[in-house]
Amino acid sequence: MEKTTIPAHLIKRFHQLGVDNAFGIVGDYALRLFAELSHRGFPVLVTTDEQGAGFAADAFARVRGFGVVATTYGVGGLKVANAAANAWAEQVPLLILSGAPGVIEREGEPMLHHRVKDFDTQLRVFRELTCAQGVLNSPHNAATEIDRVIRTMRSTQRPGYIEVPRDAVMWDIDDSDDNIDPRLPPVDLAAQREAIMAVLNQLRSHDSAAIHAGAMIQRRNLGSSLYDLATSLGIPVATSSLARGTFPERHELGLGVYLGALSPEHVVQRVEGADVLLSLGVLQTDLTLGVFTAKIDHHRLILATDNDVTVGYSTFKDVPLWSFLPALVEAAHLDAQHAESINISHEPIPAHPTFEPVETNNTVERTVAALESHLDSRHSLLLDPGEALFSAVDMRVPTYAHASAYYATMGYAVPAALGVGTADPQRRPVVVVGDGAFSMTGLDVASCAFHNVNAIFVVLDNGGYGTQRPIIDGPFNDIPSLAVEHLPSVIGCGRGWKVDTEVELDGALRDAIASNEVCLIRVILATDARSPALTRLGAALAAKA
């Protein structure tokens, strides 16, 4: 049997997956691993914090289909736990690659630094947060363990964990030619044919339909099938907040994002008022359904998940989305005359939104409108949880919008810009983030600059945690005011602006878009500033009370 090393085998697999770098912070238990990866042409891009490295790798995975965060043992690995939790909740194949104390030096249970209860504490934590774990403590199965973890991650679209003892890095290990292709959920072809007939019968017998597309469309690489289905049958498409960009929002059939009562009225009417609603790969969570303000009649619902299809109250088992949607598209092409009976009339949107600034103080609504007018296909949007995420439901994004939209971990978007910018260098990341979240991970602006990702950061500064103030206000929602517009000067590159008015905001956005360096715009808002989306949500929740 041929021999290899752990770093060489990892890199071989990463390159097969289209991954050409990791993100992370080195420590002594991971020094040799990092050195070997770098020496072999696989760099680990340094961030300011391990959690930020995890967010960057998560965002990279959302674009490329797989991401790697590398860290040291204990103090590094446990700081990545929150990023792993985010990846589990939102079904992202994020690999946590951790250095660890050597196999030999663990003998006798010595009290080595970074150890907690015992040497397996970190492993037990990640058993709760990942779909597969591998500790590479034998040269005979190290390669097959790597392959098993990667294959399971790709099959489930969940994070995985690999631990590399530092004395194992240069072992000669048995090579592996195992197949790392995902083992997709099984298909009952007879049930699938029945499900497709049931769906087409529903569409034929009703006057209007809509599609609600979710994260699993992107995770299973089904964007082209979604587009074909919508355009062949003339069905308008709304996406979930976890799937923005899987269907072009500025297309004539694009509705934007459906988020229950948070969404604009015309989106709510088209989705909730459709005679038939096809929910394709949507994670049915509280936040993706507008804190459960979505009003969807299950008699009219067709629900396609990663495992089953439900039409009304009939469930077709073992009909997974990855097989069902392409087969439905094929059947729909044969049934294309049905397109004429679908009511697709809705207000067309301009090819490019316009914004006319006036000399008045900034509001959340007008800030979003200004930003939308400057975005185009050259940009990727990143939205941090809170008002940055909610306010953007009134925006038609030109490409993709990435967010921790279900797990909702604050501080995600700034380091995620590094991941998105690295994974898709043809598009410039534009980040919208609140001042509270920016105070958590804002230093990763420096990481972006250091790695030549010249992102634009728009910081919504309302003096604290504005999303929570309408729920229960108090001094716990107030935070120190930081002059973050000076951060580019601190890191020695880029430009910064503080803008109080619409005219200043529009000018700063215009200059930032035209520049080729890191830019940071601090948008001053009133303490009680609130987006129309948050106002709509408050009214809906009050009506339910």
Regions found by a protein language model. Give the residues of each.
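Phosphate/pyrophosphate-binding active-site segments
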Residues: 1-2, 137-140, 176, 296-385, ...
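Active-site flanking residues adjacent to catalytic metal/cofactor-binding acidic residues
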Residues: 280, 304-305, 383, 434-435, ...
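Active-site phosphate/pyrophosphate- and oxyanion-stabilizing loops and adjacent acidic/basic residues
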Residues: 58, 124, 227, 369, ...
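N-terminal alpha/beta PP-like core and its mobile active-site loop of ThDP/TPP-dependent enzymes
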Residues: 1-336, 454-457
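Thiamine diphosphate
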Residues: 93, 107-117, 390-545
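Catalytic-loop motifs flanking and including active-site residues across diverse enzymes
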Residues: 52-53, 79, 122, 324, ...
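Active-site diphosphate/adenylate-binding microenvironment
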Residues: 7, 15-18, 25-28, 33-38, ...
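Active-site segments that bind and position negatively charged phosphate/pyrophosphate groups
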Residues: 247, 387, 434
